């Protein structure tokens, strides 16, 4: 044994090839300080070992290295620039040391080699992967750029254009795609990986492969003609800005760094990378995006914990077919849980099956599935008109029409059919879980399971705990949602649950602006372009359906009359009463036609302005700041109320619910991250300026206490 630590072991194999194995004590290899220090020591030990002719890097885990330990590095990001600069320089000395070894090196890659893992393999001369490998630099998704030489080495290995695409998108690449552009040198079956790596290394040792020329290319400036370089980077800037926009600076920084370092050798190019990394690490966007990553880990960790106390879900059922039922059936079946789809109407069953088939066909067209896989998924969906087909279901999802009496009747009927241990859930968006539980003999085996439309696209599922729901029931439904590929958050029962409860105060703020003469299209523009929502409130209401919004608004007003009850008609009432329901009937705030691809196309409709003008009088202009304040303050305060009342357990889960359920701008991190960025005291002062607008603008006593102590919702 040449070297051994808790994270790395180095041994000398036959033919004087050294094998360096990353093998941390946890379930995966990450680049933390301990691993980085161990790698440095291991390389020193190798340099002092006589007779070593080559080095193979490998992993003792299913994945090579999944990336940096973000939790550890967050503390570094808060340090002074010179401290961060020193850390980057020290870390990069280790990767340079690997790259400068006096013999050829190869990485044998299985599973994920992401972030720092990808930067490690780029520092070796050769790279071979098995069929399970996934390679990439996802740092831009966290609001930063690679910091261990990724922007320097990757362009010199695969060319500037390919590197720009890899790094700016942050997507991980399959081995076939990596081989095509030259990021790796071969792909082999998993059982052949290390044997093939040793053989390739032998070819380098015997100079059949010119490893020194490969290495020199990574140390030198990019070989791009000047005119071609100018055109390439100019085009990249335009394309990246179009996709990333002004709110996400990291992808554009990647283009600028690679361009600036193109004519430099390694040392100078790394300095360019370091400076950009430090600048981005200090931004609110990086804090927000890293926060989302950590919150996502927390929510997934809770789901894994729930799975340990959950009963197994080997078969499921959905009551009510159609688009929603078909979407739920598709999601369950495609993730391996067979499902029965029950309806009282054959036409609805056909619609549900067609929805599943349509989604599967789209996967085939994108190259993400095959006809054989499609057949397998469809075989996992059983359509039926007969309740008896549900007898074996471990979990039933009720997804019939949003009417309390209909749901109560269906739930009572299904309880008579399913097994003693079956769990029944309701996919309701507005009806109290405690109310529906009254129709059941075993309310402890019942909870809410609120999917968002369209089911296949929206990652969130709200699991609603009723007052009688058992912990095993909730845990089992959380585990089933996670098995379906969804992100489940547990919320306690209340009108609107969590997501809709905080959404409707936002709509109320929007309606208040319209009553005061604001232009809904101007509001949408501000909320989309400046605040960062994927859709402004008028457009979102049209997509949700103004009839649906009208009904949900009434539920919220009944549940929270002190602040959500209305005086007189608002804009939603005006549209609803004019039979303008949004996209579903081609007219809402906007009017809709169908484009060439069959998608709804939004256009301004003078009639909607006429209706609003008749109801509320002349239009007035409002500043962007006022539009943002009047729409966002009610949502933010209601989100805080949900935390204070225990409707949602943590700021992290609230923020994930908002990002995944509503499309809250990720670069702002969610309501609680946004509050911490603004400063709670600053927000309270802002809200107080609008307190005269009513109960939705009144901050809570606890918020005032937090503001007085300069507190925050996340640890500083």
Curated annotation (Swiss-Prot):
Pfam families: 3HCDH, 3HCDH_N, ECH_1
Claim: Ribosomal protein is one of the keywords in the record: no
Enzymatic reactions: a (3S)-3-hydroxyacyl-CoA + NAD(+) = a 3-oxoacyl-CoA + NADH + H(+); a (3S)-3-hydroxyacyl-CoA = a (2E)-enoyl-CoA + H2O; a 4-saturated-(3S)-3-hydroxyacyl-CoA = a (3E)-enoyl-CoA + H2O; (3S)-3-hydroxybutanoyl-CoA = (3R)-3-hydroxybutanoyl-CoA
Binding partners and assembly: Heterotetramer of two alpha chains (FadB) and two beta chains (FadA).
Protein name as it appears in the record: Fatty acid oxidation complex subunit alpha
PANTHER family on file: TRIFUNCTIONAL ENZYME SUBUNIT ALPHA, TRIFUNCTIONAL ENZYME SUBUNIT ALPHA, MITOCHONDRIAL
Keywords: Fatty acid metabolism, Isomerase, Lipid degradation, Lipid metabolism, Lyase, Multifunctional enzyme, NAD, Oxidoreductase
Sites marked Important for catalytic activity: 119, 139
Entry-linked NCBIfam families: FadB (TIGR02437), PRK11730.1 (NF008727)
InterPro entries: 3-OHacyl-CoA_DH_CS (IPR006180), 3-OHacyl-CoA_DH_NAD-bd (IPR006176), 3HC_DH_C (IPR006108), 6-PGluconate_DH-like_C_sf (IPR008927), ClpP/crotonase-like_dom_sf (IPR029045), Enoyl-CoA_hydra/iso (IPR001753), FA_oxidation_alpha_subunit (IPR050136), FadB (IPR012799)
Family, per entry: In the N-terminal section; belongs to the enoyl-CoA hydratase/isomerase family.
EC number in record: 4.2.1.17, 5.1.2.3, 5.3.3.8, 1.1.1.35
GO function term, MF aspect, one: 3-hydroxybutyryl-CoA epimerase activity
Pathway, per record: Lipid metabolism; fatty acid beta-oxidation
Assigned GO CC terms: fatty acid beta-oxidation multienzyme complex
Positions contributing to NAD(+) binding: 324, 343, 400-402, 407, 429, 453
Binding, substrate: 296, 500, 660
Residues covered by region (Enoyl-CoA hydratase/isomerase): 1-189
Gene transcribed to yield this protein: fadB
Protein task: Involved in the aerobic and anaerobic degradation of long-chain fatty acids via beta-oxidation cycle. Catalyzes the formation of 3-oxoacyl-CoA from enoyl-CoA via L-3-hydroxyacyl-CoA. It can also use D-3-hydroxyacyl-CoA and cis-3-enoyl-CoA as substrate.
Active site: 450
GO BP term (any one): fatty acid beta-oxidation
Sequence segments annotated as region (3-hydroxyacyl-CoA dehydrogenase): 311-716
């Amino acid at each position: 044994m040449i070297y051994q630590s808790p994270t790395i072991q180095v041994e000398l194999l036959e033919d004087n090839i050294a094998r360096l194995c990353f093998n941390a004590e946890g379930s995966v290899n990450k680049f933390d300080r301990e691993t980085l220090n161990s790698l440095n020591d291991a390389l020193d030990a190798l340099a002092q070992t006589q007779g070593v002719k080559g080095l193979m890097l490998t992993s003792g885990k299913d994945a090579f290295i999944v990336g940096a330990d973000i939790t550890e590095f967050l503390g570094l990001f808060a340090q002074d620039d010179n401290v961060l600069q020193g850390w980057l320089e020290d870390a990069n000395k280790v990767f340079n040391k690997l790259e400068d070894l006096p013999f050829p090196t190869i990485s044998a890659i299985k599973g994920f080699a992401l972030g720092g893992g990808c930067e490690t393999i780029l520092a070796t001369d050769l790279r071979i992967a098995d069929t399970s490998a996934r390679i990439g630099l996802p740092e831009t998704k966290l609001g930063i750029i690679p910091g261990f030489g990724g922007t320097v080495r990757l362009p010199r290995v695969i060319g500037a254009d390919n590197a720009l695409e890899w790094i700016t998108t942050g997507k991980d690449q399959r081995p076939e795609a990596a081989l095509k552009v030259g990021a790796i040198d071969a792909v082999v079956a998993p059982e052949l990986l290390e044997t093939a790596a040793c053989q390739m290394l032998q070819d380098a040792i015997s100079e059949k492969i010119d490893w020194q020329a490969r290495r020199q290319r990574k140390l030198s400036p990019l070989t791009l003609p000047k005119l071609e370089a100018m055109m390439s980077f100019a085009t990249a800037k335009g394309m990246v800005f179009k996709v990333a926009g002004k709110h996400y600076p990291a992808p554009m920084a990647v283009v600028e760094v690679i361009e600036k370092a193109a004519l430099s050798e390694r040392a100078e190019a790394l300095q360019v990378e370091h400076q950009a990394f430090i600048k981005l690490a200090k931004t609110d966007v990086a804090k927000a995006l890293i926060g989302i990553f950590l919150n996502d880990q927390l929510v997934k960790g809770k789901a894994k914990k729930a799975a340990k106390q959950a009963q197994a879900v080997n078969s499921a059922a959905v009551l009510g077919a159609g688009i929603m039922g078909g979407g739920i059936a598709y999601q369950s079946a495609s993730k391996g849980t067979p499902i029965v789809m029950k309806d009282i109407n054959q036409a609805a069953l056909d619609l549900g099956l067609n929805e599943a088939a349509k989604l599967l066909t789209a996967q085939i067209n994108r190259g993400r599935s095959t006809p054989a896989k499609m057949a397998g998924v469809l075989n996992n969906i059983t359509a039926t008109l007969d309740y008896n087909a549900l007898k074996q279901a471990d979990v039933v999802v009720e997804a019939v029409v949003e009417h309390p009496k209909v749901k109560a009747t269906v739930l009572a009927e299904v309880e008579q059919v399913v097994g003693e241990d079956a769990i029944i859930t309701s996919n309701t968006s507005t009806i109290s879980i405690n109310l529906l539980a009254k129709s059941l003999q075993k309310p402890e085996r019942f909870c809410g399971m609120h999917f968002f439309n369209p089911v296949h696209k929206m990652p969130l599922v709200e699991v609603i705990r009723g007052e009688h729901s058992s912990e095993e029931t909730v845990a089992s439904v959380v585990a089933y949602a996670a098995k379906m590929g969804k992100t489940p958050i547990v919320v306690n029962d209340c009108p609107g649950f969590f997501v809709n409860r905080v959404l409707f105060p936002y709509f109320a703020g929007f309606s208040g602006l319209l009553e005061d003469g604001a232009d809904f299209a101007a509001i949408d523009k501000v909320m989309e372009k400046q605040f960062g929502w994927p859709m402004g409130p008028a457009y979102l209401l049209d997509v949700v359906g103004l009839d649906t919004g009208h009904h949900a608004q009434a539920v919220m007003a009944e549940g929270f009359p002190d602040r959500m009850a209305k005086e007189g008609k608002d804009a939603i009432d005006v549209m609803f009463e004019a039979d303008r329901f949004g996209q579903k009937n081609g007219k809402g705030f906007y009017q809709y036609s169908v484009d060439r691809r069959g998608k709804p196309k939004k256009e301004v409709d003078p009639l909607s302005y006429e209706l609003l003008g008749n109801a509320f009088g002349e239009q007035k202009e409002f500043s962007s700041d006022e539009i943002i304040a009047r729409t966002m303050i009610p949502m933010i305060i209601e989100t805080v109320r949900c935390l204070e009342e225990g409707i949602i357990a943590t700021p992290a889960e609230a923020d994930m619910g908002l990002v995944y359920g509503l499309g809250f701008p990720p670069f702002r991190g969610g309501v609680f991250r946004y509050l911490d960025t603004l400063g709670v005291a600053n927000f309270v002062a802002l809200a107080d300026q609008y307190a005269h607008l009513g109960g939705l603008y009144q901050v809570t006593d606890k918020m005032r206490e937090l503001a007085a102590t300069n507190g925050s919702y996340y640890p500083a």
